[in-house]
Amino acid sequence: MRTSKRDSILQAALHVVETDGVTAVTYESVAAASGLTKGGLLYHFPSKDALVLALHEHLAERWDHEMINVLGKDPDEATQDERLAAYARVSAPSATGPELLLMLEASTDSELNKPWRRVISRWIPDPAEIDPTDPRALQKMVAYLAADGLWLSESVGACLLYTSDAADDM
């Protein structure tokens, strides 16, 4: 399957984030990285904000699809334990520095955070719904937090501990 120009632009934008950081994403830098003209970018993304939001949506969707592939079925048909296991298996090996930078950016911008929240809410139990007297529910929340901690560790290269066995143990 041929990569669409839109996907190529998003990959180029991700490359810019990887090499120069989120603030370096401009029409000029992405045009240079993608080999397209600024006009070609404007056709797909009418503003820099639209480009950055599309990058967040693209990565969140990719993450969601990876978890669905690991799960092997529709998340709506899976148990919370199955969804959490898929989340843990996908989180650490998919960790990258650019994704961490984008997640940090999204943490302070409600529009950029929406794609990530959509995915997370599908896979992780709402902390407000956790019964603090239920040990199993608390174990699930700890497993979720451990998966996130492992993702963070892997994304900054601080401690590369991931194995598929570690995810299975969560």
PLM region descriptions:
Residues 8, 16, 22-50, 54:
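Helix-turn-helix
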Residues 52-59, 66:
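Alpha-helical DNA-contacting segments of helix-turn-helix folds
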Residues 61-100:
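Hydrophobic alpha-helical connector segments
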Residues 64-65, 107-141:
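Amphipathic alpha-helical packing segments from all-alpha helical-bundle domains
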Residues 99, 133-157, 164:
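Hydrophobic alpha-helical segments that form the core
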Residues 162-170:
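Single conserved hydrophobic/aromatic residue that forms the stacking wall/gate
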